[in-house]
């Protein structure tokens, strides 16, 4: 499929702000030689928030959250809250006390909310135990607590009915390829902020007026996501769909060689600066993989005016 040349920067600067449809970036964690680089992280956050990102989501899956120490998560929280106005910190831990400690720290640093995966790894936790984890987290802070629902990673689906039963969830990030699944949270939790977490459903999420999207592509193409949102707001569904298809081409290419590591290279390809590297077990792309990725997205890049 061919796509029109799209001058995103100019369009973004002219377009009206659409506050009800937020772009949330699950920001990458920037490492150099296996060590966290907070300054590089903050500079990356400043760049993407200047180009359409509304909220920064720290220590999520794209940010390699489960592989970070508590101290590293705190350092990222410091860097994020100093660089961005709106920050959500993902606090999940197999140590519930550490999750609560990070949530309290995030609140003290000015984060607007915290989020958490359900307790994972332990396959037979009861619903009562899951509920206690979230209720203890909610009781520990006064800022909103988001459910981060990611069944493919956690092995458990805390669906809309279950989320309502928790009684304290004020937001949801649903990493799910089923838009109907995500929409159900708006039905059962109408006052909650509900985001879908799939790059392939950015257009669809905006079209049905979810509160926003949490899209890893916001790290490397925030302008494209802003273009989709603006097209939906203007009623230009054909344009929005065309932009989604362009995004799909890029994401599918990156998934071919390991998406979590490819995001770092895509930042350099599309934003023009080096964003560090991931850390094992998400290992950096090798030179051959980087060359393959650049060739694979070259056609898509040629159709963007960035």
From Swiss-Prot:
EC number: 4.1.2.14, 4.1.2.51
Site (Proton shuttle): 148
Subunit details: Homotetramer; dimer of dimers.
A GO MF term: 4-hydroxy-tetrahydrodipicolinate synthase activity
Coiled coil: none
Family: Belongs to the DapA family. KDPG aldolase subfamily.
Disulfide bond annotation, renumbered to this chain: none
Catalytic residue list: 173 (schiff-base intermediate with substrate)
Protein name: 2-dehydro-3-deoxy-D-gluconate/2-dehydro-3-deoxy-phosphogluconate aldolase
Binding site for substrate: 61-62, 148-150, 173-175
